[in-house]
Structure formats: structure tokens, C-alpha cells
Amino acid sequence: MDAIKKKMVAMKMEKENALDRAEQLEQKLRETEEAKAKIEDDYNSLQKKSIQTENDLDNTQTQLQDVQAKYETTEKQIAEHEQEIQSLTRKISMLEEDIMKSEERYTTAASKLEEASKAADESERNRKVLENLNCGNDERIDQLEKQLTEAKWIAEEADKKYEEAARKLAITEVDLERAEARLEAAEAKVIDLEEQLTVVGANIKTLQVQNDQASQREDSYEETIRDLTNRLKDAENRATEAERTVSKLQKEVDRLEDELLTEKEKYKAISDELDATFAELAGY
């Protein structure tokens, strides 16, 4: 009888110990599941941060490309303005050369006109001399008539040259007026281009400032990209570590569940044995 009582006490203590171990295992299982849930939340948060980091990186790269495209467009516009200024400068030089040539032609025509006037005056003087010397011999008269005829021819040629010179002078004056008009238009265009160049210069300075700011932003973007890349790598590493931890915890949960099941089976066996013992005692 004492042996049975001792056995019952031992079985009762074993039952209590089994209950304690079961409660401890259940508590450990709950803690493990909570840790697993926390790690899964951290993992999901890291995934969201990783996606946000990639989006930030894409946006930064897009902004950098936009700044570079605007800078290249501005450089092309500046080059086009410089080419236009060079072309107008060449046209102005050509107009100045045309004006100089027109002035030279005008000077030449004036000289020829003066020569023609002198020849006409000389012919008139010869004619008057011939009239005063009308009493000379026939040979002298013939000679003088020839000289007069020659003088008239020279005068006619001088008149023709004068008319030609006057015509050329009129053409030259028209050309000069046109050249002056073109020169005025060119000067106005140059003034306009100088104003545009001033504006372009101001724009260039602004663009240089913007370019410097863009370079600073680019450096900042690059630093941000490096930081985001490092954070992304760190997040990926943490995510990988979290996956490993979740896997370990899942294995631990499975082990604890198996151990809890084993303890429950032991508890059931002890309970069945106690029930059988009580039934046996009741039979006495």
C-alpha cells in the first residue's frame, strides 16, 4: 500500500512537472511566434524601404538626365548664335569692301570728267586761235581744220566719256545707296545681335550658375545614390539575415511543437495511468 502511495506521489509530481514543462514550452512557443511575427514585420518593412529606395534612385537618375539634356540644348543654342554673329561679321566686311570699291570708281570717274573738261577747253581755245588766224595760208588752214576736227573728236569723246562717267556715277550712287541701306540694316542687325548676345551672355552666366548648382546637385545625387545603394545593400543583407532567422525560428517552432506534443502525450499517459491506479485502489 505504501508502495502504491509513493508511486502515486511520484506520478503526481511527474504530472505536475510535465504540466510545468508544457506551460514553459507553450510560453516559449508564444514568444517564438511573437519573435517570428516581429521579424516578418521587419522583413516586410525592409522590403518596402528597399522598393522606396529603388524608386528614389530612379527619380534621381531621371532628374540628372533632365539637367544634362537642358545643359546640352543651351550649349547648342549658344553655338548657333556665335555662328550667326560670325556670318554677319563677314557680310559687314564684304559691304565695307564694296563701299571702298564704289568710292574708288567714283574718284576715277571724276578724274576722267576733269580730263574731258580740260580737253574741251583746249579745243575751244584752238578754235578761237583759228578764227583769229583766218588770214593764214591754206596748208595752215587745213592743218588747223584737222586740229579743229581732232579737237571736236576729242571733245565728243570727252562728252561720251563724261556721259559714261555720269552714268557709271549714277549707278555707283545707286549701288552706294543700296550698300548704305544694307550697311544700316546690318548695323541694326549687329545692334540687335549685340543685345541678343548680351541676353545670351546673361543666360550663359545664369546657366553657368545653374550648371554649378546642377554639378553640386549631381554630387549630392551621387552621394545620395551611393548612400541609397549602401542602404539598399544593407537592407538586402538584413532581409537575407531575417529570412535565415525566420527559417531558424520556424524550425525552432516546429521542434517546440513536436516537444509539446510529446509532453502532452506523456501527460496523457500519466493521466491514464493515474486513472487506472485510482480505479485499482477503488477496487480494494
UniProtKB/Swiss-Prot annotation:
Q: Where is the composition biased (Basic and acidic residues)?
A: 32-41
Which residues lie in Polar residues bias regions? 44-60
Ranges in coiled-coil conformation: 1-284
Which branch of life, at top level?
Eukaryota
Q: Which InterPro entries match?
A: Tropomyosin
Region: Disordered, residue numbers = 32-60
Family to which the UniProt record says this protein belongs: Belongs to the tropomyosin family.
- Supply the name of the protein: Tropomyosin
According to its UniProt entry, this protein's organism is: Mytilus galloprovincialis
